[in-house]
Amino acid sequence: MRILLIAGGWSEERDVSLSGARGIHAALERLGHQVTLFDPCRTLAGLLEAAQAHDFAFLNLHGQPGEDGLVQALLETAGVPYQGSGPAGSFLALNKAAAKEVFVRNGLPTPEWVFLPAHPGADWEPPFAFPAFIKSNNGGSSLALHRVSCPGELARALDELFTRGGEAIIEPAVEGVEVTCGVLGDEALPPILIRPLGAGFFDYASKYTPGQAEELCPAPLPGEVTAKVREYALRAHRALGLRGYSRSDFILTPAGALSLLEVNTLPGMTATSLLPQEAAAVGISFDGLIGRLIELGLAAHGKQQEKA
């Protein structure tokens, strides 16, 4: 097939997107496809025409545009199938505050939060005790994620976040280990337990620098905990109206309680990314994962794959 690989964009996660795109590009060619890279580095001008000249679009955008549903909406307009979730589910999952409302309504445990549409002022404090995490309401890859332990740190973090623009969300820091679990098709994959080796939490450097975090897959957890993680990941995927694949991030407390943090609709696809590790744990190679995502994308759009 003629595949348009859409990567790059103008968000702060541009470099991560392009890094992952290199591996995806190679995998698509190994699978026999003709691949063209489209990088909407400043605008989406030309995307509609480029997509219509191809049989399929493979998205590897992070943040905005891409995870917010805009590119998906344009592809729907072009009538070109693509992998992953549609416009509505993508927008909902990227908006962390809105997604947490969905979690609560569907009985999925998530830390309490305060949504900040604008800077609340230098003297503002949250209605819960420190420490807390404050982050962009519409970003990913742990960019602009701050752990704050006092009013002074909070004030500095707020200034930095709102200098970048956009919205923020703050929630109490739940102590425990980080666990992530992907969904592929209609099944949850084996979860991964994450132990950052430098930072106290899974920040941007830990996520994308080899050797900065210990990632254990399958996670060495009791069977009932593993089952609950997979159940919650699948429930969150369905509650948000997602399709194809996703990855849910959790905190597991020392008492064994789970807190759902967020759901990613376009999980990372770099050499250190989590979803490919989970797929490998059930015997799916990286190329096999890319091929499966294409199959799921075609099926979601009522298409069948022809020979490459």
From Swiss-Prot:
Binding-site residues for Mg(2+) 2, renumbered to this chain: 262, 264
Under the heading InterPro entries, the entry gives: ATP-grasp (IPR011761), ATP_grasp_subdomain_1 (IPR013815), D-Ala_lig_Van_CS (IPR000291), D_ala_D_ala (IPR005905), Dala_Dala_lig_C (IPR011095), Dala_Dala_lig_N (IPR011127), PreATP-grasp_dom_sf (IPR016185)
The UniProt catalytic activity note for this protein reads: 2 D-alanine + ATP = D-alanyl-D-alanine + ADP + phosphate + H(+)
Residues binding ATP: 127-180
GO BP, one annotated term: peptidoglycan biosynthetic process
| Domain ATP-grasp intervals | 100-295
Keywords recorded for this protein, A-Z: ATP-binding, Cell shape, Cell wall biogenesis/degradation, Cytoplasm, Ligase, Magnesium, Manganese, Metal-binding, Nucleotide-binding, Peptidoglycan synthesis
Q: What Pfam families does this protein's entry cite?
A: Dala_Dala_lig_C (PF07478), Dala_Dala_lig_N (PF01820)
Query: Which pathway does the UniProt entry assign to this protein?
Result: Cell wall biogenesis; peptidoglycan biosynthesis
Provide the cofactor note recorded for this chain's UniProt entry: Binds 2 magnesium or manganese ions per subunit.
Q: Which cofactor does it need?
A: Mg(2+); Mn(2+)
SUPFAM superfamilies, per the entry: Glutathione synthetase ATP-binding domain-like, PreATP-grasp domain
Q: What is its EC number?
A: 6.3.2.4
Q: Which residues bind Mg(2+) 1?
A: 249, 262
Compartments reported by the entry: Cytoplasm
Could you cite one Gene Ontology molecular function of this protein? metal ion binding
Q: Which domain of life is it from?
A: Bacteria
GO CC field: cytoplasm
NCBIfam families (alphabetical): D_ala_D_alaTIGR, PRK01372.1
Q: What does this protein do?
A: Cell wall formation.
Q: Which HAMAP family match?
A: Dala_Dala_lig (MF_00047)
Q: Which family is annotated?
A: Belongs to the D-alanine--D-alanine ligase family.
This chain's protein is named D-alanine--D-alanine ligase
Which organism does this record belong to?
Answer: Oleidesulfovibrio alaskensis (strain ATCC BAA-1058 / DSM 17464 / G20) (Desulfovibrio alaskensis)
